[in-house]
Structures are given as C-alpha cells and as structure tokens.
C-alpha cells in the first residue's frame, strides 16, 4: 500500500531508542525525510544510520523551552519545513500520588505538556498554510485508565491529550490531522526498567494482556506511519488504543 508520504519531512522526538526509533524507521521506509531528535546525539546518529533515506540528527532537551522552540527551524534548515510532527517523551519517574515534589512536577510538565504546546505553536501555522500536516502523540493508555504508581505520567499525558484533541478540531478543515496513540505494553527499555527486566514484563503480559504478549516496536512504527499517511486523512481528534486489548474502557 502506498501511504502517499514519500518526500514529506518529519520531526520525531525521542527517536534514539524504543518506540520513537521504531517510528522514525517506519517513516523512513516510506520515503519520509526524518529529523531524529533526543538528548543523546551519539544514539541518534546510530539510529539514523539504520534509516535508508535522508535524515538529520538534532540534539535537544525537551525540558528546555528555548531549545524546543528552536527545533523546527533547525529541522527546516536541514530538511525542509516540518510536515509530520511525532511527539514522544520518555519517563517521567514512577511514584505514588503524593510522593513527587514540586521540582519533579515542574520537570514533567515542561517535557510532557509544554514542549508539545511549543512545537504545535511553531509547526501548525506552516501546516495550515500548506494545507497538509500530521501530528501524532506517542502517549499511554493512562490517558484513559490511570496506571498505579505513575502519577506524573498519568496527569501530564492526560493534559497533553486534551490539548491535542482541542487543537485537532480547530485545524481539521485545513488538512491537518492530530491524533494520540494510547500505548500499551511494548518491548522497550522503558518497560523493562519498570518491571525489572523484559522477561518479567513478558510474563506479566501473558497473564493480563488479552493478546497474551508484549507489543513489538515495529508494529507500533507501522501504525504511526499509517496515521501519518494520506490514507488516514479523515482520522483526527482521537486517541487510538494500541495495547493488545488491555484497556477496558471504550
């Protein structure tokens, strides 16, 4: 199936590893020119080497508002204006509802909420002018069903999902789609760190995920590539569960 995005320019956050890297690779296979962004330039360069098409590497700390604001211009200078924006921020640390201090709350807010808002402000006007754009947020099932001991993630990701759903309805008539992926359990370093090992995560998935397994990063990348495609032009303003049937609420 031709997804119709050959030659488009994408900015993928958190692209050095895990689901962000899988998304960057999937877009690259479709001929998208991909700017990979994360803190570690060395890891980004290794990830970029695995993508066959044209790429750019941009180091950024998503907790630094000024650096985030400058990111689209850096991408434009290297590849062209951002047409596909993939929002993805790892963490934050786990903890019960009243455990996190103000500093932890502020740091999580800057990365998980403020960074997406800033990038939308910088990228959406150009998308609307060109009559085409895609924004996809790599989020969590916690936006529907809070996950125990992940308070910072639960609260901040839900806020971002609300912002993006609002934005989607404001830009839908301009050819810009905005969607969130409510991500379940995938075989990543992040999940391994939460469970102690990937083997422990797999065992838990067999017990309580209806699909009886963890998701594979390449499955994730393929779905996001489709959501970014011409084929999905009528899909906007929604949160798509990708969780092997784990989420019970509709």
Show the residue positions of the predicted features.
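Alpha-helical segment proximal to the catalytic Tyr-Lys
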Residues: 125, 169-170, 233
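Short C-terminal tail/terminal secondary-structure segment
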Residues: 1, 145, 225, 236-250
């Amino acid at each position: 199936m031709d997804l119709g995005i050959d030659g488009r320019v994408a900015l993928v956050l958190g692209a050095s590893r895990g689901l962000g890297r899988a998304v960057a690779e999937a877009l690259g296979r479709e001929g998208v020119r991909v700017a990979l962004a994360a803190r570690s330039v060395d890891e980004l360069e290794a990830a970029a080497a695995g993508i066959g098409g044209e790429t750019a590497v941009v180091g950024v700390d998503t907790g630094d508002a000024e650096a985030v604001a400058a990111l689209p211009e850096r991408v434009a200078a290297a590849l062209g204006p951002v047409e596909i924006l993939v929002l993805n921020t790892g963490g934050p640390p786990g903890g019960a509802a009243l455990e996190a201090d103000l500093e932890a709350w502020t740091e999580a807010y800057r990365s998980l909420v403020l960074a997406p808002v800033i990038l939308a402000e910088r990228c959406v006007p150009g998308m609307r002018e060109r009559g085409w754009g895609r924004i996809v947020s790599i989020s969590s099932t916690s936006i529907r069903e809070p996950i125990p001991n992940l308070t910072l993630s639960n609260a901040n990701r839900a806020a971002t999902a609300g912002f993006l759903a609002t934005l989607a309805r404001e830009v839908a008539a301009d050819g810009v789609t905005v969607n969130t992926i409510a991500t379940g359990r995938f075989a990543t370093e992040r999940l391994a760190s939460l469970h102690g090992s990937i083997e422990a995560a797999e065992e838990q998935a067999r017990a309580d995920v209806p699909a009886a397994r963890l998701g594979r990063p390449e499955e994730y990348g393929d779905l996001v590539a489709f959501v970014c495609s011409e084929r999905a032009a009528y899909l906007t303003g929604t949160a798509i569960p990708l969780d092997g049937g784990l989420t019970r609420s509709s």
